[in-house]
Amino acid sequence: MSEISTALSLENCPCQSSHHYADCCGKFHLRQAFPETAEQLMRSRYTAYVLKNIPYIVVTTVPSQQTLLKPRLLQEWADNTTWLGLEILKTESLTKTQSAVEFKAIFQGEECEQAHQERSIFVKIEDRWYFVDPTVSLPTMKQPCVCGSGKKFKHCCGGFL
């Protein structure tokens, strides 16, 4: 948490919202508030990677996937990546409880700057937004959805991944 303590003095939040870190992603990282939109969650997760706050990455992943994550590997990745910027390209409300955020994250590669572009899916469960991680095992289309809606995966989040 020392990275967070240091970041609280940052004038500009790493998510590039143009807000002070303490008034932006900092309040989410310290669990003083929860993101109200999928975009806020996306920005706070990016900032968590910048600050190497892996516990936040885990708890903001949909609960049914949290035990499938490998925090040690996430930490290694964060330690070996220098993030340079975030650009939100598009935010879509898919349903009342599902949204997509397309973004581009700029990072320093071995020899030059590189960009990672992705369309991420977020789901709202009990008034909190979570990231649906497509890199871990997902249920088959006929199994219950990862979001806990009670619907089959193919009729819920599976249709967006």
Swiss-Prot record:
InterPro entries: NTF2-like_dom_sf (IPR032710), SEC_C_motif (IPR004027), UPF0225 (IPR023006), YchJ-like_M (IPR048469)
Record PANTHER family: ADENYLATE CYCLASE-ASSOCIATED CAP C-TERMINAL DOMAIN-CONTAINING PROTEIN, UPF0225 PROTEIN SCO1677
Assigned protein family: Belongs to the UPF0225 family.
Protein name: UPF0225 protein HI_0277
